[in-house]
Amino acid sequence: MNLCAQYLRQAEALKADMTDSKLGAAEVWTSRQALQDLYQKMLVTDLEYALDKKVEQDLWNHAFKNQITTLQSQAKNRANPNRSEVQANLSLFLEAASGFYTQLLQELCTVFNVDLPCRVKSSQLGIISNKQSSTSAIVKPQPSSCSYICQHCLVHLGDIARYRNQTSQAESYYRHAAQLVPSNGQPYNQLAILASSKGDHLTTIFYYCRSIAVKFPFPAASTNLQKALSKALESRDEVKTKWSVSDFIKAFIKFHGHVYLCKSLDKLNTLREKLEEQFQRLILQKAFSSQQLVHITVINLFELHHLRDLSNEADEHSYSSDEQISWIQLLGLFMSFLGVMLSRALLNKNREEIMGECPLPAIKVSLDWLRLRPTVFNESAMDKRQYIWPWLVSILNSFQPKEEDVSNASVIPLPEEFELQGFLALRPALRMLDFSKGHQGIVIGKESLLIHARHQRLISLGKWVADNQPRLIQCRMSDGLVLFITDIPEIVVEEPQEKDTPVLQESSNGEQTPNESTHGLKSVLSAGKNQNSGLDGSERPVVTFKENIKPREQSREQNRNQNQRDTGKDRAGFNKGNGVQGKNEQKKEGKRKSEVKKNSHDKTTDAGKQVKTQTELRKTPVSEARKTPVTQTQTTCSSQFIPIHHPGAFPPLPSRPGFPPPAYVIPPPVAFSMSPGFTFPTGVSVPAPFLQTASHPQSANPVQTGKPSHIPYSQQRPSGPVALNQGPPQPQQTQPPPPQTSQQALQQSVQLQLQQQQQQQQQQQQQQQQSPTKQSSQLGKSPPHHHSMQQSYMQVPEQPGQMWNQHQNQPGMQKMPMQMPVKQPFFMPTQDPMKLFEHPMSMQPQQPSMDKKMKFPEVKVQDFYWDPPYHMAGEGRSTMADRMGKRQPGVFCSDQENMPRGPPYEDNKSSPLLPPDLLKTLADFEEEEELLFTKPHDFYQALAGPLNSAPGRNMFLPNQSRLDSGADVIGQSSLLPRFSIQDNSYQNNSIFSEAYGKNMTPSSKPDAPMMHQEPSLYSLFEGNPWSPSLPASSDHSTPASQSPHSSNPSSLPSSPPTHSHGSMPFSNFGPIGTPDSRDRRANDRWKAEKTGVSGFGLDYLPSASTSSVPETNSWHQGAPTSTWAAQDMPMEDSSTVLLDSFKSIWSSSMMQPGPSALEQLLMQQKQKQQRGHGNMNPPH
């Protein structure tokens, strides 16, 4: 305590110095570094004391946030003559901040023995020793405090990624944080900010509600929700007779604005009737994804819970007239929506449930709430809607229920249940479920397992209704079978006959076929923006969360969506993840609406007739029966949440194969992107998604200005311990790129191109080695492209769509072999399972030469992403891997992707892929008692790797989606390019792929004998990759000030190869979630061009070693720099140079966003900790 008090006094003095205007930039920077060191010591020494003193808040605000805000304002000032220099400084500072929090998280986990799934053990990284030199002075904190500070780090890593326009990476961090402590509302508030920046209104409101309705609500969320609803009330009323999904969502939010703000309640009845009518019409057209329906339901439940907390029913409450009106209208809307969803479920078949179009998840959530609120059955709204119960009876009987279905309830959470952890309105209903396993605990494997589990839940709920409300439903059991019956006459529900274009969702749902939407759960956020997704008049609008939805080129997004439709039927789950169209939809919403109106007039008319007939048959009010309107939330409805890690996707928290992938996407473990310079030992498996960087523009609120987002953790931290074993999600784009159709041909051409690229890359590597800093500075501005790399890579990219698609599809074949040797030894990025099987073998032979050639140059993923609009998204990881492979011999994501994932990091030592040198160094590191960063870049990558390699398959990404996104992730996060991260296995083994059996390819990466890992927690939903794969443009780490442009593919360099490998992005130091989609970072870090200072990873990775080659071969085949000994030399040089030039670099312009700043920081710490262990830093 005395020691920490002393630290605190020193910190106060430093804070005062930093505010002294007389100090120069160098002095302020020095004070900031000292302040960071002091706060870090306090947090590690006495966490409880530090949290009580709000040290974690001061650390963020004074050491990072204030400086970030200042630099952002200067960079946004167009009149500033030094704007480019400021932008470079901002990029470098964000890189350093990301590195700091990544390191802090790693140290906290090591010191307090916290086992986060998103974290790789230090011994396996070869960077830090797991042993602590002095633990006597450390005060053991409460488990809840450990969980809280880890969540704090994850949240701010997400904030930093958001400032860097890496929205997918940011979402992954936020989701991991939410999973770590579900009862804390801050991560949900940050997710809402991300959704808002993407124009996904439904998702925005959903997460604000989630942030409020938890045990520890986030104070700013209530204000944010009020502002959002007030803005909705200011919008004009919809006068169209046929609404699009976007129109519906806007009206739905407006309805809740009236209720929540108690304004103009006289409009509620008319608006409710219109909503019911349009919901009925839209849902019959399958305009909503499962996830959108769940979000709509949860928002209703939030408001109902807000109006009346029926958990305290024993207490007598007196409600005002306004509260009574709001309650009656909202409960009527809720029950009408439930009835409409039941009628839709009757028309659905198993396919719809698998694909994510089915309303059963939302129905299950609705019945959960009714079971907790039995007094609601006495309300008049229930009596008026008794026609819904015969439909429930028919649905339950269609499951052919058995007695064991009622008695043997599973404790494994469904995707919709996993997403609602901590939600107060449903908390009692979820208590019996086992969330301890995180995303991996979600039902995965065969589609039938998840579907059967949901059916069991529904049967149990039906049995409860029969036992407690016999007037509505009765239940009979005979011969082990359960039969549900009812005395209420059933109204016939008919499939709409209209062929008109269904109302398009805001996102790209309209563009997607219903099948596609069902397949993948995608982020509504990105999808909502793509309003221009073009639905053919003949196609039904499918509400899907498009994970790959990007606010970039609409045409590309549309093409991706169309391709996804074609392939989506095959990979419906993955396609749904594409949310790119959603964003475009918003842009083209006017056009779409007009077209939709034309197309949907017929359907609407038919639907209206059907509704009328149904209502006539029913004795209940016709208006209510048919009033269940389905409006499109701009982004939410039309597109499912796209994993933030995916280029355009904002994934919903949980998603599982059983749950229609489009509806739920569980983010894969957060990918801790590290400086690409860090090379992982062959045995170390690092998920590519962790290395991916989201390039999504930070949109309106990249930075939350309100302090509420940074409420003292001491106040926020939950009283109870939180499971720490959940890995960060690894959202990956699930949309299959359209250009993949000629994947094989492309693969062949890519192989040739790769060979050429290898040569070019070798040249580039030499160039890079000569001038590492130049490239890094270039990357910071607009990553310069290595010409040789560009040429070789461009040759493949000449058909950017083809080559990238090929690589994405065949990264396993072409790039994988090249990349495999280097990456496998260090890190194996995941790649499309399909790709892995198709190309791993053919590519391996080329890998050695390719690795050497491609080692340093990194090809940007942006072009790649954009060219195959969603191919990249879907195949992001493989694509990234491909890029990495092409770009960097050392960073061959695709090769490694092709190869099966190696053993978990824990097994790295035993992995045959590990070079003997690395094994030896690892052993030495373990012997060390002090934390030792062998290589700053390596450390970050290691961190990134841990997230990616979180045990388990990617639960959030469909196999293809994961694979695709995995490539993107790898490519994007040049950090991991060398290491084919375990993304392959994740992709191949994604929970979604298993659950839905879609595009499921066994990790056929025979090239690298990597141990198969369990599906990552975040790959639960096949259709919704959660891995941190980012859109190509998103992956680019553009200056935060330029965030608005970074999201546009056009703003990014057109040639993916050039950006990726040409220069190092400013975010080279990006930690776990910072990998830039631009592989440039990886290139710079890994490329030999930085051999002197920043060639940490590539230089040491064997460029020529093939994945099939033993670890020794991979290590030794690579340029001598690939060996640890070789690395030692560069490390010494780099450390000397970095330390000597660190101050000058920072004070001057920080133009080198690459590893320079972060490396220097790490080097300083290294030197402090090494105590003569210089030899132990081989991978520097």
Swiss-Prot record:
Disruption phenotype: Morpholino knockdown leads to a phenotype ranging in severity from weak to severe that includes an elongated hindbrain, altered midbrain-hindbrain boundary, stacked somites in severe phenotypes and a mortality rate of 97% at 5 days post-fertilization. Gene3D superfamilies: Tetratricopeptide repeat domain. GO terms for cellular component: cytoplasm; telomerase holoenzyme complex. Residues 728-740 have a biased composition (Pro residues). Residues 547-559, 584-606, 615-627, 1076-1090 have a biased composition (Basic and acidic residues). Its main location: cytoplasm. TPR repeats lie at residues 151-184, 186-218. The keyword Cytoplasm applies. Residues 741-778, 1039-1065 have a biased composition (Low complexity). Keywords: Cytoplasm, Nonsense-mediated mRNA decay, Nucleus, Repeat, TPR repeat. InterPro entries: DNA/RNA-bd_Est1-type, Est1-like_N, Est1/Ebs1-like, TPR-like_helical_dom_sf. Residues 504-520, 692-718, 1026-1038, 1103-1125 have a biased composition (Polar residues). Disulfide bonds: none annotated. It is found in: Cytoplasm; Nucleus. It comes from the Eukaryota. GO terms for molecular function: telomerase RNA binding; telomeric DNA binding. Residues 496-636, 692-795, 893-913, 1019-1127, 1148-1180 are annotated as: Disordered. Plays a role in nonsense-mediated mRNA decay. Recruits UPF1 to cytoplasmic mRNA decay bodies. Together with SMG5 is thought to provide a link to the mRNA degradation machinery involving exonucleolytic pathways, and to serve as an adapter for UPF1 to protein phosphatase 2A (PP2A), thereby triggering UPF1 dephosphorylation. Required for normal embryonic development. This is Nonsense-mediated mRNA decay factor SMG7. It comes from Danio rerio. The gene is smg7.
